[in-house]
Every structure is written in C-alpha cells, then in structure tokens.
C-alpha cells in the first residue's frame, strides 16, 4: 500500500471534520508519522480492534469504527432477515470516545437494516454478554478501553472495539 496516496486520499475526503483535516495537515512534512498512520489498515487482534487515537487508517477513530462496523454488518446481513431481526446489542465504557464510537456503530448497523439495542449509559462488559443472551441478539459490540502494559507511552490507554459474533 502506498501510504502517501492513502494520506492524500484521506486529506481530500469530505467526511473529515475541520479538526481532523487540521490534524492531518499538521503532519504533512513528517513522512514517518504519515507512514505510521497510513501504511495499512488497523487489524483485529485477540482483543478486537485496538489502536492509538488519531486520524488515519492505522489508528482508532470514528472512520475506522464505521469501516469495521460495515464489515461486521455484512456478516450479520449474510445470515438473512432473521439475523438482522435478532440484531446487535452495543455497550460502551467511560473512556476515549466510547459513546461516540458506540453510536457510530449503531448508525452503521441500522443503515444496514439491523435491529440495534444500544445501552443508554455506560455498562460493564458482562452486562453486554447478558444482553446478547437475554435478547437473543445475533451479535454484540463492545466499545471499551483497556490499560496498556507498564512502560506504555504517555497516551496510556488504547480504545478497543470488539464485535462478537456467534451462530
């Protein structure tokens, strides 16, 4: 992947806010920073989608959340109308834009015709597990943060986006 082309594509996107565009403009003369943000997409690991909060393809931000949720929604839609009717439960914790990310995930799912149950306030992870079973949801999405290991950089926590799918 040509990270400079990807950077320019993002910079030209009408989906960016003024603040996001300014953030990308601020790194225009820093090829190492541009490469770190655009060398490839953020990948799912054992704890879900996790990354540093910043604008870019390889960072945690609202655009990456929407992209990941769209892929997840396609999996649910492949189950047919029953999967869409059963829908998803979505919860969040109190850190790092969790509520914003949860709402964005809900919007993407709803736009795909998937029934959404989103908690109105912060909830612990076990409550999401309970909700998925109690409401017989097709899936659950948890927008949370996890502390990083000792010696982590100053940014301290990394948000995690963890969709879960069960058949």
What are the residue ranges of the model-derived segments?
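Ferredoxin-reductase
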Residues: 9-13, 83-159
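Short helix/loop capping segments that flank catalytic or ligand/cofactor-binding pockets
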Residues: 52-54, 99-100, 150-152, 165-167
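Gly/Ser/Thr-enriched, mixed-charge loops and adjacent short helices
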Residues: 33-38, 42, 153-167
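Residues at secondary-structure transition points
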Residues: 51-57, 146, 157, 162
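An N-terminal, well-structured beta->alpha segment
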Residues: 2, 7-105
